[in-house]
Amino acid sequence: MLNGLWLGFFIVAAVSALVQWLVGGNAGIFAAMVESIFAMAKLSVEVMVLLFGTLTLWLGFLRIAEKAGIVEWLAKVLGPLFLRLMPEVPPGHPAIGLITLNFAANGLGLDNAATPIGLKAIKALQELNPSDTIASNAQILFLVLNASSLTLLPVTIFMYRAQQGAPDPTLVFLPILLATSCSTIVGFLAVAFMQRLRVWDPVVLAYLIPGALLLGGFMALLGTLSATALAGLSSILGNVTLFGLIMLFLIIGAMRKVKVYEAFVEGAKEGFDVAKNLLPYLVAMLCAVGVLRASGALDFGLDGIRHLVEWAGWDTRFVDALPTAMVKPFSGSAARAMLIETMKTSGVDSFPALVAATIQGSTETTFYVLAVYFGAVGIQRARHAVGCALLAELAGVLGAIGVCYWFFG
């Protein structure tokens, strides 16, 4: 799947460039594509520099958590649930605790913590994988849920809106929560269908129903807060949770006689080893994405959608937000640039800008996630992971558009 996808990016880019050259007379398109290849190669190295530090830091703290028994405790608590969703993962396996920590970090918007924990989890799952290069069912479910954008506190979206002068930066908070719920639910159900998981098992429902009620109560509580209070809570909760997690690892580790410094250094060394293996996969995927963007293929797609919507007689206001949706699976920085451009062009509280902000907060950089997570363990055949992840992405986009029409007309 990844092989065909990667090759397809280059073929589509080449066809698009030829059309622009032969029909539109744009001879500079090839220079732009070549420039993009080298720019993406440079960007890959810059991303790796950041990942080296982040992975080294968090895998160090995670080693303390492992030796303190925190990960093992989480694995025991959630063992019955994962036994049904990931049957190939034995009860009490460390991967269960790591997956739980990863989902919690993602939900709170702690990306710097979530990625290293996620890479540790995918490596733990790889130990159970009978194949060195083919993704297992458990790895696919984990990756698709990661790619579905598990977000409860989209602090960065609030920041972008505040920077552009929005009087109420948190206006899109509830729309983002609803849209990201759509993407996560669809991603989960898609994988459940492909893998024939027993979603209606009483044990699964015993975990999911209280979790859904707790989430609903949390959302209802947040909905009663003012914009100022909500923004303040988002910032405080994220930072306090992050530092509190570090202190929890250290205190429990010290109480259980773990040599925390030595454990940290031991884990940090592993982080360095994980990071250096990612570079070839990042270069491959980011260069292909860069060529596709520079070729103008995404612009062709956007124009086609606009004409189709007009032909159907539907409202076209949301179309101006689609550049963010079209590039988000490929590049988070490009989607961020598209969002800011939409805010500046249409106005920060215009309908297209609100839709774009909701899309940005409820979708994920699917191909980056694929490259990083599967690249870390050498997976080359993703099976149904790409299809399910993109379906979740589509659900997030459609959910964002629908919710914004509901909230903002």
Predicted segments — roles?
Residues 1-53, 159-292, 311, 384-409:
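Signature of multi-pass transmembrane helix bundles
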Residues 11, 58, 67, 107, ...:
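Short glycine/serine/threonine-biased micro-segments
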Residues 30-127, 256-345:
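Membrane-embedded alpha-helical segments and adjacent helix-loop junctions characteristic
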Residues 38, 45, 94-96, 131-139, ...:
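Hydrophobic alpha-helical segments, principally membrane-spanning helices and signal/leader peptides
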Residues 100, 104, 139, 230-233, ...:
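Generic signal for short, ordered secondary-structure residues
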Residues 113-114, 121-162, 166-196, 322-409:
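C-terminal transmembrane helix pair
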